[in-house]
Swiss-Prot record:
Native organism taxonomy: Eukaryota, Metazoa, Chordata, Tunicata, Ascidiacea
Keyword Hydrolase (UniProt): yes
Gene3D superfamilies in the cross-refs: Protein tyrosine phosphatase superfamily
Pfam families: Y_phosphatase
EC number: 3.1.3.48
Catalytic activity: O-phospho-L-tyrosyl-[protein] + H2O = L-tyrosyl-[protein] + phosphate
Gene: STY-18
Keywords (A to Z) from UniProt: Hydrolase, Protein phosphatase
Origin species: Styela plicata
Enzyme class of the recorded protein, top EC level: hydrolase
Annotated positions binding substrate: 83
Protein name: Tyrosine-protein phosphatase 18
Keyword Transmembrane: no
GO MF, one example: protein tyrosine phosphatase activity
Domain Tyrosine-protein phosphatase: start-end pairs: 1-115
Similarity annotation: Belongs to the protein-tyrosine phosphatase family.
Length: 115
């Protein structure tokens, strides 16, 4: 989260699930819905989770412990990518991509997107 804050990133894109076929694929680095978790000098509040067909959009509220910094970050997690394969169709991935582009435009930020 420190990198997100330092670079003022507003959008995170994730193309994997945390677990597939009972195996851990990546670390869950965010709190559960409506929960807050501290990560060093920042706290992350998972303000919203919206499930779409094939992906999840999360809206995080990030604050520094001294309350000097406050920012909103969106995470898009594609959940239909099969382990060791490719999706049967790209329609959900293309739809998520459109949402990501729209979100980048709405934030007005020129900060890098984290993938």
């Amino acid at each position: 989260w420190l990198m997100i804050v330092e670079q003022k990133c507003r959008v995170i894109v994730m193309l994997a699930k945390c677990f597939e076929a009972g195996k851990k694929k990546c670390q869950k680095y965010w709190p559960d819905s409506k929960e807050t978790k501290a990560f060093g000098r920042v706290t992350v509040f998972n303000a919203e989770e919206v499930k779409y067909c094939g992906f999840i959009r999360r809206r995080f509220r990030i604050e520094s412990v001294d309350k000097v910094l406050s920012m909103e970050v969106f995470q898009y997690q594609y959940i239909n990518w099969p382990d060791h394969s490719v999706p049967n169709t790209t329609s959900n991935l293309v739809r998520m991509h459109k949402y990501v582009i729209q979100c980048l435009e709405e934030t007005g930020s020129d900060a890098p997107m984290v993938v």
